[in-house]
Amino acid sequence: GLHSNGYTLINDMLWRHKLSYKDSHIGKGTPELLTPTTIYSPLIDYLLNEIPILGMAHITGGGLVENLPRVMPKGLTAHVDYNSWKMPEIFSKIMLAGEIPEEEMKRVFNLGIGFCIIVPPDVNGIDNDIECWEIGEVRCD
């Protein structure tokens, strides 16, 4: 979900189009707007003892575009496959209602990915209660 991120852009968009949360299709039937941010620390505490973690990034303002590079050593780049997970519907609604370009959506919102861990390629699947995906790979520049 939104993870407490992007509400400024949503509010600006609603003001521009003279809409309210109540009257817009963004607010109607959209529990994602009120869903609390997931707390990842219990999962990370567990995983630190189970698998080698090479990097971690909480995906907040700046989306994957700005947050993943912050945890990458010089010379390495994250290559994200934005088709590797199903983006929650709230982001499509925001993009459509606000006429927000896809690249701006990638810079502002997490698009459904709230936290990333970087693991060696031989780590296959992580068994936990939080849905997760392999979303890309790390490459040398």
Features from the language model and the residues they span:
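Loop-centered beta-sheet repeat module
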Residues: 1-7
